């Protein structure tokens, strides 16, 4: 039996990051089983925004919506965890950028019973835009 992996992404507006997340996860060397977007009251309609990507997507995508009554990151993550069907949950923010072997590295670390944690690498908006341009060139 294969372990199921769920990625839970907190989201608020800036829906282009949701598209980038789906595209990046489709390029992973280890595929996930489920992607859950926990939307903290975005004004735009997420599923309409990503509908063209759903056709060829190899993993299930869920959208969990909660009303925007202020920044509630912990509640968003808890709501995503409640909806998850995976054996292993990976929590990400909407604007994270990662390598194509990111999921595989986390999965392999888990199999070796290592502690798994993540640390943010802060970058300027200019650096982030350059990175995003490079990513978009691949797709």
List the predicted regions and their residue ranges.
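Cell-envelope/extracellular polymer assembly enzymes that use nucleotide-activated donors
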Residues: 4-6, 34
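Short, well-formed alpha-helical segments that are part of the catalytic scaffolds
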Residues: 14-27
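Short alpha-helix within the catalytic core of nucleotide-sugar-dependent glycosyltransferases
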Residues: 22-23, 47, 86, 100-111
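Short beta-strand/loop segment that forms part of the nucleotide-sugar
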Residues: 33-42, 64-66
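A conserved acidic beta->alpha catalytic loop
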Residues: 39-50, 96
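Glycine-rich, basic loop-to-helix element that forms the pyrophosphate-binding segment
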Residues: 67-84
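Short aromatic/hydrophobic "clamp" motif used to bind/position activated sugar donors
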Residues: 89
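Conserved donor NDP-sugar-binding/catalytic core segment of glycosyltransferases
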Residues: 101-139
